[in-house]
UniProtKB/Swiss-Prot annotation:
The gene is rpsT. This is Small ribosomal subunit protein bS20. Binds directly to 16S ribosomal RNA. Residues 1-28 are annotated as: Disordered. Belongs to the bacterial ribosomal protein bS20 family. Keywords: Ribonucleoprotein, Ribosomal protein, RNA-binding, rRNA-binding. GO terms for biological process: translation. SUPFAM superfamilies: Ribosomal protein S20 (SSF46992). Disulfide bonds: none annotated. NCBIfam families: S20 (TIGR00029).
Length: 88
């Protein structure tokens, strides 16, 4: 346990941020998982809608600093490539 006032405050802030980041990451994983499930079943329209939702959540997570911008770009690219493979 910290004794210094500023460190006690820093611990409080870190805990708040950790919980917020955990929530964002969880919803991100859920969105991507739902996309993959739709892609597995071959439902192109549903997968396309879920791809947009997942891409939006990836962008938000990157802008909030929860994940790195390059990681968001790589994941968006992977799901976009999977949607493109439906039409090819």
């Amino acid at each position: 346990m910290a004794n210094i006032k500023s460190q006690i405050k820093r611990n409080r802030q870190n805990e708040k941020r950790r919980l917020r980041n955990k929530s964002v990451k969880s919803s991100l994983k859920t969105a991507i998982r739902k996309f993959h499930e739709a892609a597995e079943t071959g439902d192109v329209e549903k997968a396309t809608v879920l791809m947009r939702d997942a891409a939006r959540k990836l962008d938000k997570a990157a802008s909030k600093g929860v994940i790195h911008a390059n990681q968001a770009a790589n994941r968006k690219s992977a799901i976009a490539k999977r949607v493109a493979s439906f039409s090819a």
